[in-house]
Amino acid sequence: MSKLNMTPREIVAYLDEYIIGQKEAKKSIAIAFRNRYRRLQLEKSLQEEITPKNILMIGSTGVGKTEIARRIAKIMELPFVKVEASKYTEVGFVGRDVESMVRDLVNNSVLLVENEHKEKLKDKIEEAVIEKIAKKLLPPLPNGVSEEKKQEYANSLLKMQQRIVQGELDSREIEIEVRKKSIEIDSNVPPEILRVQENVIKFFHKEQDKVKKTLSVKEAKEALKAEISDTLLDGEAIKMEGLKRAESSGVIFIDEIDKIAVSSKEGGRQDPSKEGVQRDLLPIVEGSVVNTKYGSIKTEHILFIAAGAFHLSKPSDLIPELQGRFPLRVELENLTEEIMYMILTQTKTSIIKQYQALLKVEGVEIAFEDDAIKELAKLSYNANQKSEDIGARRLHTTIEKVLEDISFEAEDYSGQNITITKELVQSKLEDLVADENLVKYIL
């Protein structure tokens, strides 16, 4: 399947494999992502004039808001970051400032580009790693030896490399030089402080950045892979490409946008900093320049997708300027009992398939009767109605409860085929779901 140039129809067909229903949401987002590709095909002067149409997704938790955006960004290999609006504070308050979401996007973009470059050089990196380990295992060739000896050494080296590739020497130990583990730097601090931190770390580690370690050949492969990757990759080019890609095709998903809306019903009881966060967010969404450790990035061509349940507030409770920056609005449907059943049976990587694969590792074959699946869907739906509606996430907890004993005693069932029946599902869940006081314990 093509990547960046996927058509809206192809995008929706791909999403249908993983997410049931939500046709309108899929359609709107597919068009928005396709427009990213269309814009990049235009002349530079016209590209600058076309800004993305940001999207506001309205729907309860667990109905697929995040999953739709995340799946598209993944298949199209676009820089993507998901953040929660409620985690940010107004400038001047203790907490994360809104610009850090752009810095997170750039970090993800650089990592994405780096992994792509590593994949292209994969064979070259592996060859260099194998050769280096083989030379460590073979005694070095003395100076001034004959051509015949040199040829013998080359043949021995080749045989040694073949044995390393086949894993025959994985348990052998060798001494290699590896780079010291770098100190973690908090990427949420302002770029100026980041640069100072990096310079201080470089200064103190310059002379003693490598240490000798005795590792197994298997461990050495991984350790050397990272080192050789750094020498073969053009770090500066990767940073520049990552910055450029974040700027032209980055996607920021802002969840819980409703948590910073100031509800007119609550009036003065609302946290005054909520409106402050909205005002800080406004220039980022409108288009501004944000400094990152990789350089400056303009935000006007980043696609922003905001999402929220809006149970206690309305989209109109957001400040008017911010509302105007999210012109496309999509309402997602709540999950019905039928959709719950389809999620369990029709998605490509359904929860049932996941649990079957996990237990197969222990040699346990699990099969679900259709009536059992329908009962799971029914009881999960009922739990959502009686308690807080958490959408498809409820299915995880109900299935976990049904399979709890089998998972715990998996070694006792090894080599057996187990069928999950409607009666078993009822015995594990029905009492809990029937008692409204206990529903909350099924999350």
Residue ranges with predicted function:
Residues 1-443:
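Non-catalytic accessory segments flanking P-loop/AAA+ NTPase cores
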